[in-house]
């Protein structure tokens, strides 16, 4: 078809990645190796860092970050919260990003993971060689001797030390003088001989300990000028912020605990000291530099504050027992014509770790129940020294083997790959004892092999089929690092191998075959030429060897392992995975982790994501059918029909409502028909699941294509379905009335009580249907009934009748109130934030279109007259994965069910809602709003005083139990000028350690909360309220929230306490925050401070309540409390029933979560939390 205006487009067969939608991030690692990742243009620096961490199998990512050279050729750390592409386009000199250590530690004993220590060693060595860390020549030679021993092993493996001439020994400052280099090489050779016998981890440890004692360790400085105009260098170090003068004056260090606040203004960077009422300013080059220095120092301070406790308590004891079996070994001398490779076998677990990282425990049951972690490959390879074997993918899946639980059989390690940062070794097979299963365990972070190289080696007979490990059943991808971080970007295919019966003589003594695998890379750690680009995703090595499956039945393995199916890949996947699956015609069907996981994608997403590999799946199908054994038949949660037609026949069983139930369901029901249809539906679902159990796998999808539920969970579901059938058969007549009453409630469901969530109510209110369902049902089958509405119809979320103008009148003295009475009486000020004025309920046709048909119908008094859909009518099950929960929440938002759900929750108690104390005339002026009052049985009672003889404050106790853990809150209004003394009395008497403030002092020119704590840095940093003296000790701004440390002193007794004040500063005047990650970080800060205070508090006040307040103490306060409780439900895998929890909260304080917008915001927060933690 011709284009208009005579335009012609050039037709090509090339596919070009558009720069507008993709970013190829080129990242240089600490060993000078380059990796590339294909990311989205919106991918943040954090996502790129996590991709690198996955590539390295690095879990302790806290200490590392990414940096680049700016256009002035200066190093700048990437802002991890912002898109990487925008930062590089705006500031970077070149698109290359570098991986390195950002936060240094006082002692390497803090580093738990071996790969973390190794990367840390590489960073320190780079700092020395590049001259970033100044040192003397003698010190550099000593460090070079340790580095040679760490990287090359014992000196007697080599005929001469000439290779040291090509090894980077000294800092760049001395590389120009050949005489100095020659003398230094001789001294290094002598030191190398002196250090003979040291293993690589021991040499690296000595190297890092030497560097730790050097001046300038962990420092990063920038040029600036002081107040006198003198040139200085200012930067951050371990202890604080240092200032080095260039005129010979001694350096000055401002320690972290002496710094009260840091700020920047234009090109000035300022420090506010806690002990002195002064501010020290420094002038940087420009405004961007001042902001960057401030951001870096704030990050260093936060790292110091969060880690100072753990730094003091961590032990640095060596585990000498594990060293014997997991240390790196020196290698024999290779053939004389070849340059000897660096003999470096990385050890596992040099320090005592909370998890086992060696195969030593493979025969011993783990009694402490810690997470056991294997990064090893026990696959011995017949090696020809004329070639190199590189085995392993970019990311090796971890194995739990038989470490977590005592099992009746011994299971060999999966054929996990061993990608490494530096080189490894080639060892003669005859030099290895075949009976030692754990003496040679290389780490699992070695370079990715080229697929063609592996195939050539296979063709040359370098890999023998009878020497492979033959188990893949326990490839625990879910516990690996790639699934423990949010939004991981890079995925690799695990190596899938099948093996015949073990016939070799050395394997007769053990029920598994012990194999070894060693790898090598370029012999020069610092080559002159550029390293080849290493792909971000490896090609799986698929070996055609027959499977021996009868020794280890898959169902037994699945029962003995604690398994959580990993979440699906996000769509669209940022990282490109390019294995040619169509060439691999044989793939193991013995691994339940790879082929039995629940499908989480929708049909459309599944089709779009999976069509490119349809051809390869068809080819894979038949070998799988042939290799399948009878006892390996497992239920499949999906059916794939018509694979050659583009997966049009994909049917999700668990999401499908049977046609018979749909046809039977009319528009309206009588009570009896509702109950019968409900029970029939359950029976049909159970029948479907039982029929599904007869299916066995005939087609397997790639792990990057789809995920299917494991057999263990299928069995549990089958038992649950049969149990529910029996329950429904017994309880059907009794549930008729209760079920018919609340049929329209979107979250009504029949659920066996497991006791995940408890409410502490002084006076419980249970209706008769609830009592009958609880008392009569033999297994406590409860239909989630709620209190009947006044008229059974939907009501607006907050109407003006709920907040009458007469109710807003408060008898306040003129000297106390901060606003004119006309504002109160005119309705301008309301406890409801963002509420339209009176008469604003009239909608134009355009407005009606905006609010959607469901909301419009509800506002006109129409309610649902159909059975709720499966996803609507039940809370999110505890068995659901994070991705399923996220999908259900998103569906409720998209379908408008959140609105209906919110409108059905009572705003106040209908019975026993007494507020008699709050309505007393003497307490009227203590209420910010006359219609937001605490219930008598839930209010916080103060010790009566002469000024407050009733002990009243507008605050309510809120208690909720999640998974046996009690969450205790105090929800209160923002203090008034005349209630500050009562506020601090409540803090003292209730033992409050954390105050969460979710408002500003003023918004839109109106007071939201009186400032009840003193400002930092002012002359009056101490204020007294009655018997309490409050002092501000420090304040830290962290973007969307500020953390302030307060000292509270009781003047009569002299006792002092520390109170943390966490103020969320990013809430807009109207609506809710847009930055969901920022709000989640605020909740994380609350959790972090709560853990800190609980660990340091006295046992009698081990769990003090969290005090939360906004202006009225119901809107934003309810959002914080509800969000934190629901996040706790997600973390403890409890039932996710948001409306029920909110109803519980409102039974303790009225009108919590005031508006629909706030309620929707809670959903968005939970969705963001699930998306961020879906890979954990």
UniProtKB/Swiss-Prot annotation:
The keyword ATP-binding does not apply. The modification Phosphoserine is found at residues 577, 589-590, 637, 673, 710-711, 799, 801, 806. GO terms for cellular component: cytoplasm; cytoskeleton. GO terms for molecular function: protein tyrosine phosphatase activity. SMART domains: B41, FERM_C, PTPc, PTPc_motif. The keyword Cell division does not apply. Residues 668-703, 789-825 are annotated as: Disordered. Substrate binds at residues 1069, 1110-1116, 1154. Residues 680-694 have a biased composition (Basic and acidic residues). Residues 898-1169 form the Tyrosine-protein phosphatase domain. Residues 796-807 have a biased composition (Polar residues). Liver. Signal peptide: none annotated. The active site is at residue 1110. Belongs to the protein-tyrosine phosphatase family. Non-receptor class subfamily. PANTHER family: TYROSINE-PROTEIN PHOSPHATASE, TYROSINE-PROTEIN PHOSPHATASE NON-RECEPTOR TYPE 21. This is Tyrosine-protein phosphatase non-receptor type 21. It comes from Mus musculus. The gene is Ptpn21.
């Amino acid at each position: 078809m011709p284009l208009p205006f005579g335009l012609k487009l050039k037709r090509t067969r090339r596919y070009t990645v558009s720069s507008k939608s993709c970013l190829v991030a080129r990242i240089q690692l600490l060993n000078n190796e380059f990796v590339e990742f294909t990311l989205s243009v919106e991918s943040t620096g954090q996502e790129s860092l996590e991709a690198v961490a996955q590539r390295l199998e690095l879990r302790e990512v806290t200490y590392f970050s990414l940096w680049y050279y700016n256009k002035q050729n200066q190093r700048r750390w990437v802002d991890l919260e912002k898109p990487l592409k925008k930062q590089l386009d705006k500031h970077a000199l070149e698109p290359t990003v570098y991986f390195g250590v950002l936060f240094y530690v006082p002692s390497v004993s803090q580093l738990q993971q071996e790969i973390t220590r190794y990367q840390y060693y590489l960073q320190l060595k780079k700092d020395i060689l590049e001259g970033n860390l100044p040192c003397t020549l003698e010190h550099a030679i000593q460090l070079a001797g340790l580095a040679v021993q760490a990287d090359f092993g014992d000196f007697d493996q080599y005929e001469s030390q000439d290779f040291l001439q090509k090894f980077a020994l000294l800092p760049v400052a001395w590389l120009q003088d050949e005489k100095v280099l020659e003398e230094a090489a001789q001294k290094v050779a002598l030191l190398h001989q002196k250090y003979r016998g040291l293993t690589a981890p021991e040499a690296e440890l000595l190297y890092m300990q030497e560097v730790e004692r050097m001046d300038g360790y962990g420092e990063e400085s920038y040029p600036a000028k002081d107040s006198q105009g003198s040139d200085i260098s200012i930067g951050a170090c371990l202890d604080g912020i240092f200032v080095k003068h260039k005129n010979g004056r001694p350096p000055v260090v401002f320690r972290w605990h002496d710094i009260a606040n840091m700020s920047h203004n234009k090109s000035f960077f300022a420090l506010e000291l806690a002990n002195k009422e002064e501010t020290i300013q420094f002038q940087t080059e420009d405004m961007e530099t001042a902001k960057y220095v401030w951001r870096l120092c704030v990050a260093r301070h936060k790292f110091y504050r969060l880690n100072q406790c753990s730094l003091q308590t961590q032990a640095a004891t060596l585990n000498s027992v594990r060293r014997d079996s997991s240390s790196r070994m020196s290698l024999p001398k290779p053939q004389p014509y070849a340059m000897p490779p660096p003999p470096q076998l990385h050890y596992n677990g040099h320090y005592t770790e909370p998890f086992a990282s060696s195969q030593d425990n493979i025969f011993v049951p783990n009694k402490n129940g810690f997470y056991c972690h294997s990064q090893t490959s026990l696959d011995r390879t017949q090696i020809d020294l004329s070639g190199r074997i590189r085995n392993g993918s970019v990311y090796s899946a971890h194995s739990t083997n038989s470490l977590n639980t005592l099992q009746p059989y011994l299971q060999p390690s999966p054929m996990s790959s061993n990608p490494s940062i530096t080189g490894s070794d080639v060892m003669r097979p005859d030099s290895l004892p075949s009976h030692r299963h754990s003496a040679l365990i290389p780490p699992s972070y070695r370079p990715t092999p080229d697929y063609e190289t592996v195939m050539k080696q296979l063709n040359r007979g370098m890999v023998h089929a009878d020497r492979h490990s033959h188990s893949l059943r326990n490839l625990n991808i879910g516990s690996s690092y790639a699934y423990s971080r949010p939004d991981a970007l890079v995925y690799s295919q695990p190596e899938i191998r099948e093996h015949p019966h073990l016939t070799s003589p050395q394997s007769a003594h053990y029920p598994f075959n012990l194999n070894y695998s060693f790898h090598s890379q370029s012999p020069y750690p610092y080559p002159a030429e550029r390293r080849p680009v290493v792909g971000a995703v490896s090609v799986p090595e698929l070996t055609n060897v027959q499977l021996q499956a009868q020794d280890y039945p898959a169902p037994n393995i699945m029962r003995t392992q604690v398994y959580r199916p990993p979440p699906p890949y996000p769509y669209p996947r940022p990282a490109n995975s390019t294995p040619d699956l169509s060439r691999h015609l044989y793939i193991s069907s013995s691994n339940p982790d790879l082929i039995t996981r629940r499908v989480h994608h929708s049909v459309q997403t599944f089709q779009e994501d999976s069509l490119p590999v349809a051809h390869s799946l068809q080819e894979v199908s038949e070998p799988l059918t042939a290799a399948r054994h009878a006892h390996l038949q497992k239920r499949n949660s999906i059916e794939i029909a018509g694979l050659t037609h583009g997966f049009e026949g994909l049917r999700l069983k668990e999401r499908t409502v049977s046609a018979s139930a749909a046809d039977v369901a009319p528009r309206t029901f009588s009570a009896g028909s509702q109950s019968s249809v409900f029970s029939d539906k359950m029976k049909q679902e159970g029948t479907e699941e039982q029929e599904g159990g007869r299916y066995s796998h005939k087609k397997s999808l790639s792990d990057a294509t789809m995920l299917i539920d494991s057999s263990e969970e299928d069995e549990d579901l089958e038992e649950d379905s049969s149990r529910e059938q029996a329950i429904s058969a017994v309880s059907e007549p009794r549930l008729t009335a209760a079920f018919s009453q609340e049929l329209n409630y979107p979250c009504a469901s029949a659920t066996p009580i497991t006791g995940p969530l408890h409410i502490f109510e002084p006076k419980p209110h249970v209706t008769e249907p609830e009592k009958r369902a609880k008392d009569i049902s033999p297994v406590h089958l409860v239909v989630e009934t709620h209190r009947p509405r006044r008229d059974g119809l939907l009501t607006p979320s907050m109407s003006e009748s709920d907040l009458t103008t007469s109710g807003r009148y408060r008898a306040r003295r003129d000297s106390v109130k901060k606003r004119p009475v006309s504002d109160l009486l005119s309705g301008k000020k309301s406890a409801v934030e963002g509420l339209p004025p009176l008469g604003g309920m009239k909608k134009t046709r355009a407005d009606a279109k905006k609010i959607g048909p469901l909301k419009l119908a509800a506002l006109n008094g129409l309610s649902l007259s159909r059975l709720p859909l499966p996803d609507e009518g039940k809370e999110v099950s505890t068995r659901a994965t994070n991705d399923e929960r996220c999908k259900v929440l998103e569906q409720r938002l998209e379908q408008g069910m959140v609105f209906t759900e919110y409108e059905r929750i009572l705003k106040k108690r209908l019975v026993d809602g007494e507020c008699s104390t709050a309505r007393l005339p003497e307490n009227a002026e203590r209420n910010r709003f006359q219609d937001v009052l605490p219930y008598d049985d839930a209010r916080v009672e103060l010790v009566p005083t002469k000024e407050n003889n009733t002990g009243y404050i507008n605050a309510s106790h809120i208690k909720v139990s999640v998974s046996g853990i009690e969450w205790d809150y105090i929800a209160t209004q923002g203090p008034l000028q005349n209630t500050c003394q009562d506020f601090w009395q409540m803090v003292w008497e209730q033992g409050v350690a954390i105050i969460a403030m979710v408002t500003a002092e003023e918004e839109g020119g109106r007071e939201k909360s009186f400032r009840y704590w003193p400002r930092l840095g002012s002359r009056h940093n101490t204020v007294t309220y009655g018997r309490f003296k409050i002092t501000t000790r420090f304040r830290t701004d962290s973007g969307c929230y500020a953390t302030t440390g307060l000292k509270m002193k009781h003047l009569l007794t002299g006792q002092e306490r520390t109170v943390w004040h966490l103020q969320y500063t990013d809430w807009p005047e109207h609506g809710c925050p847009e930055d969901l990650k920022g709000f989640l970080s605020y909740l994380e800060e609350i959790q972090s401070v709560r853990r800190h205070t609980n660990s340091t508090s006295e046992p009698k006040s081990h769990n003090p309540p969290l005090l939360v307040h906004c202006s009225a103490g119901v809107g934003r306060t309810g959002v914080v409390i509800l969000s934190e409780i629901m996040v706790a439900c997600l973390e403890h895998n409890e039932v996710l029933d948001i409306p029920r929890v909110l109803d519980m909260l409102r039974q303790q304080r009225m009108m919590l979560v005031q508006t629909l917008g706030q309620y929707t915001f809670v959903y968005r927060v939970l969705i963001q939390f699930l998306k961020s933690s879906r890979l954990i």
